[in-house]
C-alpha cells in the first residue's frame, strides 16, 4: 500500500484520484504532481513501484508554497484562532459557531448551528 504524507492511498484507484485523498491535494494539483514526477496518471496505486512513490513524495515535499495534511490543517487552525483573538467580525462568528461568509441565518445555516432546538408551545 502506498503511503504519501502520512496517508494510505486506496489501492484500487488510479493514482491521479488516489492523491486527492491527501488533504490539500485536488484533481488539478494531483495531475501537476504526476506530470512533474513523470508518472502515468492512469496507473493504479497498487501497481506503483517504490521508486515512483518516492518521486511523488519528493515532488509534494519540495514545494514550500503548497502545504499538505498536518501543516495545512495547522495553518488553517492558526488563522481561525488569530481571527478569534483579534475579535474581528469573522472571529466572532467563528466563536459563536455561525456562518462567517455573509449567509442568511433566519431559516438555514443548520450545518453551522447544529440540529434544531425546538421550543415547546404555551397552552392557552
UniProtKB/Swiss-Prot annotation:
A cellular component term, taken from the record's GO annotations: cytosol
Single GO MF descriptor: tRNA binding
Keywords for this protein: Ribonucleoprotein, Ribosomal protein, RNA-binding, rRNA-binding, tRNA-binding
Gene Ontology terms: biological process: translation
Gene3D superfamilies found in the cross-reference section: 1.10.8.50, 30s ribosomal protein s13, domain 2 (4.10.910.10)
InterPro entries named among the record's database cross-references: Rbsml_uS13_C (IPR027437), Ribosomal_uS13 (IPR001892), Ribosomal_uS13-like_H2TH (IPR010979), Ribosomal_uS13_bac-type (IPR019980), Ribosomal_uS13_CS (IPR018269)
Positions of region (Disordered): 99-124
Chain intervals with Basic residues compositional bias: 113-124
The keyword Ribonucleoprotein appears for this protein: yes
HAMAP family linked: Ribosomal_uS13
Entry function: Located at the top of the head of the 30S subunit, it contacts several helices of the 16S rRNA. In the 70S ribosome it contacts the 23S rRNA (bridge B1a) and protein L5 of the 50S subunit (bridge B1b), connecting the 2 subunits; these bridges are implicated in subunit movement. Contacts the tRNAs in the A and P-sites.
Assembly and binders: Part of the 30S ribosomal subunit. Forms a loose heterodimer with protein S19. Forms two bridges to the 50S subunit in the 70S ribosome.
Family: Belongs to the universal ribosomal protein uS13 family.
Entry protein name: Small ribosomal subunit protein uS13
